[in-house]
Each structure stands twice: as C-alpha cells, then as structure tokens.
C-alpha cells in the first residue's frame, strides 16, 4: 500500500499536487483503492472516492 503525507486537514486530508499526480498517473490507482495517509503523526487508511482533474477525494477508513 502506498503512503503519502498530508499537508493539511480541513474537513479532508489535503495532499500535494505532485502526490495526486503520482496516485493518478504513475500508480494508476482507481476508485476504491486504499492508500495510507500520514498527518500529525497519525496514520489513516483511506479509500479513493473520486478523482477530479486537479484533486482527489478520499474517505478515511481507519485511523491508527
């Protein structure tokens, strides 16, 4: 599972544009795939909910 680091948490975890590009175009992940997101030393297991041209919507599944 791929791990990414969020830069902000305002209702949703916010990833860098380069991470979004990596998820969509390099890893070719699809809706429903799981990723690990770290924010404030907490690990979240997240499911990809939808893609927009410049954003990625994820649902937080598990907080570890």
Question: In which residue ranges do the predicted regions lie?
Answer:
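N-terminal positively charged helical leader segments and presequences
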Residues: 1-64
